[in-house]
A protein has these predicted regions:
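Short beta-strand-to-coil "C-cap" segments at the C-terminal boundary of structured domains/repeats
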Residues: 318-324
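Cleavable N-terminal export/targeting peptides
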Residues: 1-29, 324
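Transmembrane beta-barrel domains of Gram-negative outer membranes and organellar outer membranes
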Residues: 20-192, 199-228, 241-253, 257-300, ...
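Active-site glycine- and acidic-residue-rich loops that bind
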Residues: 196, 235-239
Length: 324
């Protein structure tokens, strides 16, 4: 993890300034939706591009992620089995040449879902393992037991507003600096919030090449997330999490783009179970289509290290950008 983040930092140090048309530096606004991790203030995947001066960007995304993990040690038991649907509204406003402000408002639902059978078939088609998916289909059970004491349990469908995030960004030489504060507006008992305020800070860079006479953009970022004293498994929660990511996007035609991105983050909990205590490496692949002022995007996310990332995820999102 340290070596990978160091490589991202090296990339940032030699990045070019963001191009004027931020459409070519777009990314899928993915983040980890592991039920025990999505409550914290990790920003969604972003690039160095800002809204145009005096303009704004509005985005809406729908994420559906599915988990089927369990573990047991001499003194602990963990179960993560269910489906999470997250609908997020994102607004960015360029209020000054050197300042962009933003807000992200999520709505989160945890349920048994309907995708277990489809995911088993998907994994079989790709030659991936289904060894974690030998339990009943479409059930909800998120639980953590330590020394015979149930520290957390959720086994019925819940939903509600998640933790709202306020953000600011500014250009800094060849880079973009982004900071965010996540507020405790969700409910820890429903896993729609952590019950604490988190603060993040990241450095973002991008550069653009030409491939087959079309723009090929590379983006990367590295940052740190400071966690407040949350109410979900507080005995095990860490206070600091590093994160980073890289993305490649090719404008294949005037309206159609292809992209892939890799996001990484450190562990949030000191526990024997990598399912909530391990590092996260998530791969996202997909495409986007420009229809007037709207950019429509579809992405599929898969875990790379089979630990703290959701087992399967897909996202449909749309972005509207307006200049002054």
């Amino acid at each position: 993890m340290r070596r990978i983040l160091a490589s991202v930092v090296c990339f940032l140090c030699c990045s070019y300034p963001a191009i004027a048309d931020d459409r070519y530096l777009d990314s899928f606004p993915l983040r980890s939706h592991n039920p025990f991790i999505q409550i914290y203030g990790l920003p969604a995947f972003q690039t160095a591009a800002l809204a145009s001066p005096g303009g704004f960007v509005v985005g809406m995304s729908v994420d559906i992620t599915n988990d089927a993990d369990d573990g047991e040690s001499d003194s602990e038991q963990l179960s993560i089995d269910g489906e999470t649907t997250t609908i997020a509204l994102s607004i960015r406003r360029r209020v000054h040449e050197r300042l962009e402000i933003g807000i992200d408002v999520p709505y989160v639902q945890h349920s048994g879902g309907i995708l277990d059978g489809f995911i088993k078939d998907w994994h079989s088609m790709l030659g991936l393992s289904n060894f974690r998916r030998d339990g009943p289909n479409d059930q909800l059970r998120h639980a953590y037991i330590s020394d015979g004491e149930t520290l957390f349990s959720l086994d019925s469908s819940v939903s509600g507003i998640g933790d709202v995030q306020l953000s600011a960004a500014m250009p800094f030489g060849k880079l973009t600096l982004r900071a965010a504060v996540k507020l405790p507006t969700g409910d820890p008992d429903k896993l729609t919030g952590s019950g604490a305020t988190d603060v993040s800070f990241g450095v973002y860079g991008s550069r653009v090449y030409t491939f087959r006479e079309r723009d090929l953009s590379l983006s990367g970022f590295a940052g740190a997330l400071a966690l407040g004293d949350g109410d979900v498994l507080p005995e095990f929660q860490r206070s600091f999490v590093p994160y980073g990511g890289v993305a490649v996007r090719w404008q294949a035609t005037e309206k159609f783009g292809l992209a892939t991105q890799l996001s990484l983050q450190g562990s949030y909990f000191d526990t024997h179970f990598d399912d909530i205590g391990g590092n996260t490496i998530q791969l996202g692949v997909g495409a986007d289509y420009q229809a007037g002022d709207f950019l429509w995007r579809l992405a599929i996310a898969e875990d790379i290290n089979a630990s703290a990332t959701a087992d399967f995820g897909m996202q449909l999102s749309v972005r509207y950008a307006a200049a002054r």
